[in-house]
Regions:
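Conserved PLP-enzyme active-site core in the AAT-like
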Residues: 1-27, 50-68, 72-266, 278, ...
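Conserved C-terminal alpha-helix-loop-beta "cap" of PLP-dependent enzymes
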Residues: 3, 287-364, 368
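Generic N-terminal amphipathic, Lys/Arg-enriched alpha-helix
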Residues: 11-21, 30-39, 308-313
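An acidic intrinsically disordered interaction segment
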Residues: 36-48, 223-224
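Glycine-rich tight-turn/loop motif centered on a GG-T
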Residues: 40, 207, 316
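Flexible, glycine/charged-enriched surface loops at secondary-structure junctions
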Residues: 45-50, 64-65, 245-249, 268-277, ...
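Glycine-rich phosphate/diphosphate-binding loops and the adjacent beta-loop-alpha structural elements
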Residues: 264-270, 347, 352
Length: 385
């Protein structure tokens, strides 16, 4: 009996994304052995964090790096670093009186980039200053928002989160002209692997990536890369120091697991993985378009604007399903399959997070749902209670 069976928790086929609520990703092959080995010895955590971060910086072609407890923790630490730098007087003031007591405690974000994850900025104590609207941002809006209180500009790349935003190059030029650092939230911007160094080579002062998504390391890890002085300031606030970031602790097993996963990720043929996703997506589309009342199309870029395709599957009104009812029907019974909501009567299917062979039951179950009479949302909801 598996650990999940003992706990009464049902495993899920993930046709959605490397989402936190689904466990992020499955470990890369060498990760478990590396974490087990790391768990067998005590070690100086300062020394281990420094050694792992140095190797991560080398692998990602960055000036410096820091392994944190997920991308959200990276945003907290990055914001703290931009507010205080390595000035221990400011760090002490932050601890005693909060971020509002610091000279720089504001972070600028484009309106179209607002999302639930920017709560990490508030968690650091910073005040968010919003610019533009969901359609556009004019250059003078960024220029006017920057003041002596500005600690950083947070930038989210990609079509999903960058709606109405100024181009990154323009943001970098404007911010740097006023001495303001730019943080790029690239949590889900892998692949391509080149993004690990593209944003910083473009001029970003810090970039944040998840370690538990496409890298396939521990879900509780993330990577901060960028300028050495800011990475050093991040480490002041982080565990094992007694700073505000101490609760966001990364254990020795996670540090080693992340490093090994990153080494593995950079050795993989990303084009081959993309081609596999393309093949499965097209196979789904071909079959589903042969079903009465079902329309399937290719969506690219995919989730979070990444260079991985998805299928958008839409049910005709005559089939009687809403998108939520399709999703619930996919989760109901065996196997349980998680998908993402798209439009009013449509869902996304993502092949990237599937294990070999799982594309078949995904297609089979969706075909079965489309072929049977609509059972009503009430019955579906009751079956999940």
């Amino acid at each position: 009996m598996s650990i999940y069976e003992r706990l009464g928790v049902k495993p899920i086929i993930n046709a959605n994304a490397s989402a936190t609520r689904l466990g992020g990703s499955l470990f890369a092959p060498p990760v478990i052995d590396a974490m087990r080995e790391a768990s067998q010895s005590f070690v100086d955590m300062y020394q281990l964090q420094e050694a792992v971060s140095r190797r991560v910086a080398e692998l990602t072609r960055n000036e410096d790096a820091f392994v944190c407890a997920g991308a959200a923790a990276g945003l907290v630490l990055g914001t703290l670093a931009c507010m205080s730098g390595s000035d221990m007087g400011l760090v002490a003031r932050l601890h005693r009186h909060g971020a509002a007591a610091l000279p720089r405690h504001e972070v600028i974000i484009h309106c179209g980039s607002r999302n639930p994850y920017d709560l990490a900025i508030n968690l650091a104590g910073a005040q968010i200053i919003q610019i533009g609207n969901v359609w556009q941002t004019l250059p003078w809006e960024l220029e006017g928002a920057i003041s002596e209180r500005t600690a950083a500009v947070l930038y989210l790349p990609g079509p999903d989160w960058g709606k109405g935003a100024l181009p990154l190059d323009q943001v970098l030029d404007t911010a740097h002209a006023r001495g303001v650092p730019v943080i790029v939230d690239a949590a889900a911007q892998l692949p391509p692997a080149e993004n690990l160094w593209r944003f910083t080579q473009q001029g970003a002062d810090l970039a944040v990536f998840s370690g538990g998504k496409r890298i396939q390391g521990p879900q509780s890890t993330g990577i901060l890369v960028g300028k050495r002085e800011l990475i050093g300031a991040c480490s002041i606030h982080a565990s094992p120091h007694e700073g505000l970031g101490r609760p966001m602790k990364v254990g020795k097993e996670e540090l080693v697991g992340l490093l090994v996963a990153l080494e593995w990720f950079l050795e993989q043929d990303q084009d081959a993985a993309t081609k596999t996703a393309e093949r499965i997506t097209q196979e789904w589309i071909d079959v589903l378009n042969g079903l009465p009342g079902v329309t399937a199309t290719r969506d690219f870029p995919g989730e979070s604007g990444r260079l991985i395709p998805r299928a958008i599957v839409e049910f005709a009104p005559a089939l009687g399903y809403t998108s939520e009812e399709i999703r619930m029907a996919m989760l109901d019974g065996e196997p349980a399959i998680d998908t993402a909501l798209a439009g009013e009567r449509s869902i996304y299917l993502n092949a990237e997070t599937l294990e070999p062979g799982e594309d078949v039951p995904v297609l089979r179950k969706l075909c079965s749902i489309a072929a049977r009479p609509h059972s009503g949302s009430k019955k579906l909801k009751e079956s999940r209670q």
